[in-house]
Swiss-Prot record:
One MF term in the entry's GO annotations: pyridoxal phosphate binding
Signal sequence bounds: none
Residue numbers of N6-(pyridoxal phosphate)lysine PTMs: 35
HAMAP family referenced in this protein's UniProt entry, alphabetically: Ala_racemase
InterPro entries noted in UniProt: Ala_racemase, Ala_racemase/Decarboxylase_C, Ala_racemase_C, Ala_racemase_N, Ala_racemase_pyridoxalP-BS, PLP-binding_barrel
Enzyme nomenclature, EC number: 5.1.1.1
Cofactor: pyridoxal 5'-phosphate
Active site, renumbered: 35 (proton acceptor), 255 (proton acceptor)
Organism from which the protein derives: Shewanella loihica (strain ATCC BAA-1088 / PV-4)
Entry protein name: Alanine racemase
Pfam families: Ala_racemase_C (PF00842), Ala_racemase_N (PF01168)
Binding residues annotated for substrate, in chain numbering: 130, 303
Gene: alr
PANTHER family in UniProt: ALANINE RACEMASE, ALANINE RACEMASE, BIOSYNTHETIC
Amino acid sequence: MKPFPRAEISGDALKANLKRLRQLAPQSKVMAVVKANGYGHGLLNVAHCLASADGFGLARLEEALELRAGGVSAKLLLLEGFFRPSDVATLVEHDIDTVVHHESQLEMLEAASLAKPVTVWMKIDTGMHRLGFNLDQFEAIYQRLQACANVAKPINLMTHFACADEPDNPATAEQARRFEQMTANLPGDRTLANSAATLYWQATQADWIRPGIALYGVSPVVGDLGRNHGLEPAMELVSQLIAVRDHKAGDPVGYGSYWRAKQDTKLGVVAIGYGDGYPRNAPEGTPVWVNGRLVPVVGRVSMDMLTVDLGLDATDKVGDTAVLWGKALPVEEVAEHIGTIAYELVTKLTPRVAVCLE
């Protein structure tokens, strides 16, 4: 018997999305971003399905070590870099690349005693203003990295876009111009493009692209769908009806009794709630897919359950499947109803949700 709720992960969709992104960036290698437990899809699940990727991008050293322990031998890159002097030796031991975005990291590299140098990606702040060396720091920091025996040569170069998910925003082109101006004629690989830039700013694809959300079949752009770019949703979040009840006009349902039926109907209770990561703030009308149609959430989402209006003539029964998002109901559309982004929905599922590779 399959557990519920569960996130069904399509390995075929993951592979198809990688293939599609290679088609969109044929001159670039792919650094598949699998941070945050593979965007909620399961870190090892995703890495093994995407074994043909040229490398994997991660946020935490622990994630990289989990991949190495799971038999992944591909290039690994720590996108936030390292934070403790002891981490530097771990990078060498497990052959892990690191971003260097702050002088404190450079100081740790300069002070380390290592068996071999570390592969470094120097991050330049071209306009995101979150991580990276300012443009006026670039020359001095680059020369220190060049002089550091613990840094493998050539030094790789990167930046991150603030507004690539706004296809009409000129800020991305300006960031790319600044990057090119600072790095022209320098050796080393370059990476600028995240998912949005890969899809919308082809001129920024460079040596490596760093797709994250697009690998999972989701568009990074609000109001857009992954399928518009030939991508397939890799996650289907499913549960089931655990009750179907006749409900009279005027009667409330759920905590606070704030929703009341305008007419006689049937309500279905779905076994999923905010304890599973489904947003408590999902408003009335948020769609759920039941037996080939969309039905609206009514009443407040509770810890373990939510309620949907099935309609007076519904023939749904206990045990029927309810799809919270997936092929028939894109996660981007659910996110728009709730007032959030698809990234948040797929990454906030709790351990109560079984993640099952199909």
